[in-house]
Amino acid sequence: MNPTLALTEDLIRRRSVTPADEGCQAILETRLKAIGFDCEALVSGPDDFRVTNLWAVKRGTQGKDGKLLVFAGHTDVVPTGPLEQWHSDPFAPTHRDGKLYGRGAADMKTSIAGFVVAVEEFVKAHPAHAGSIGFLITSDEEGPAHDGTIKVVEALSARGERLDYCVIGEPTSVNALGDMVKNGRRGSLSGKLTVKGIQCHIAYPHLGRNPIHDAAPALAELAAEVWDAGNEYFPPTSWQMSNIHGGTGATNVIPGHVTIDFNFRFSTASTPEGLKARVHAILDRHSLDYTLDWTLGGEPFLTPRGELSEALSSAIKAETGFDTELSTTGGTSDGRFIARICPQVIEFGPPNASIHKIDEHVEVRFIEPLKNVYRGVLERLIA
C-alpha cells in the first residue's frame, strides 16, 4: 500500500476526539525518531482535559544558523455526530468510489501523514540537508485550544526558538487539490452583552423597563455599522450576533435582562481595541444599562508574498498544474498562535467540503500529490 495512505488509515483508526490523542502522536514520534528527530512531549491542561502536544526537530548541517521549516497540525478531530447517519464506522477507514472515509480524513490526518512521509523521503534523499525541519502537533485544535499549540509556542518563545517557515496542514483546497492556500486569517473577537431592565407584569409596562426594547435600536446600529473597508488581503470586518437570550419563559412577564452574544471577524484594517471602543460608544449613546465581557480568540495574521508562498505555489504548480489562489477567508486556525514566533505561516491541505460533516472523506487521488507538494516545499527551502 502507498505509505501515505497507510499512515492516514492508521491515524483515522485512532478515536482522537478533542482532547484525546489516542496514540496518534506516539506513531509520529516513532517514525520521526527513526530518521533523526529529537522529540519532546508537552502535556498540559486540567486532569479532565489533558492535552498532548509534540514538538520534534531535526537540525540540518547549518545547525541553528540555518532556516527552520515547521509542519504544524492537529491529531484531534471533532465528534462524529449521529453514528447511524454514517455509511461506515467513522473510525474504520473505508474506501468507496475512490474516496477514503473516516473522521479526520480531510481535517487533518491525511495532511499529517503527508508531512511525515514527505520528510522521510526528503531525509533519505538529502541526508546532509542544510536547513532544519520541525513538527508542531497538538490534540487541542478543534476544542478550546487553551492548552494546545499556544502552549508549545509559549515554551518555544521562552527558550528563544526561531521558526522561519511554517506550513499548517489545514484543508484549504476547495474543488481540487491545490486550487487555494491560506496565507492569513481574520482575527476573532467575541462579546457577551447583558442589557439590564426591570422585570414586571407585561400588562403594566410602566412599572418596569423592557431591556429587549432598550437593546434593539443599539443592536440595529451595530448590525448596520461599517467597521472598515478591508484591504487587498482581507474582506471588510464583519459583526454578527449568534445568540439572544431573554425572558423567563412566561408570556406575561417583561424580562429583567437580555443577553446577546456577538462576534467580530476582523481584518488587519482594525484592531481589537478600536472595535471595542466603537461598540462601547454606540451602546453608551443609547444610554443602556449594560455589562460587556470580551474574549479575544485571536489576532489576524498575514504572510505576504515571499519565500514560503513562492515555494509552496511553485510546488503546487509542479504537482497539480494549478496557479494557486492565496486567500484569507474562513475561520480561525492555530496559525494565529504560530505567527507570534514565525514570520511566514501558510496553510495548505486537501479539499474541505466534507470537514466536520457526516461521511467526512478525502479523494484517494489527492493523497500522494499532497505529500509530493509538501516534499516540494522541503526541496525548495532547506535542501
From Swiss-Prot:
UniProt pathway annotation: Amino-acid biosynthesis; L-lysine biosynthesis via DAP pathway; LL-2,6-diaminopimelate from (S)-tetrahydrodipicolinate (succinylase route): step 3/3
GO molecular function list: acetylornithine deacetylase activity; cobalt ion binding; succinyl-diaminopimelate desuccinylase activity; zinc ion binding
Cofactor binding, per record: Binds 2 Zn(2+) or Co(2+) ions per subunit.
Binding residue positions for Zn(2+) 2: 107, 142, 356
Catalytic reaction equation(s): N-succinyl-(2S,6S)-2,6-diaminopimelate + H2O = (2S,6S)-2,6-diaminopimelate + succinate
Class of the enzyme per the UniProt entry, highest EC level: hydrolase
Reported function: Catalyzes the hydrolysis of N-succinyl-L,L-diaminopimelic acid (SDAP), forming succinate and LL-2,6-diaminopimelate (DAP), an intermediate involved in the bacterial biosynthesis of lysine and meso-diaminopimelic acid, an essential component of bacterial cell walls.
Family: Belongs to the peptidase M20A family. DapE subfamily.
Descriptive protein name: Succinyl-diaminopimelate desuccinylase
Species this protein is from: Cupriavidus taiwanensis (strain DSM 17343 / BCRC 17206 / CCUG 44338 / CIP 107171 / LMG 19424 / R1)
Lineage: Bacteria, Pseudomonadati, Pseudomonadota, Betaproteobacteria, Burkholderiales
Encoding gene, per UniProt annotation: dapE
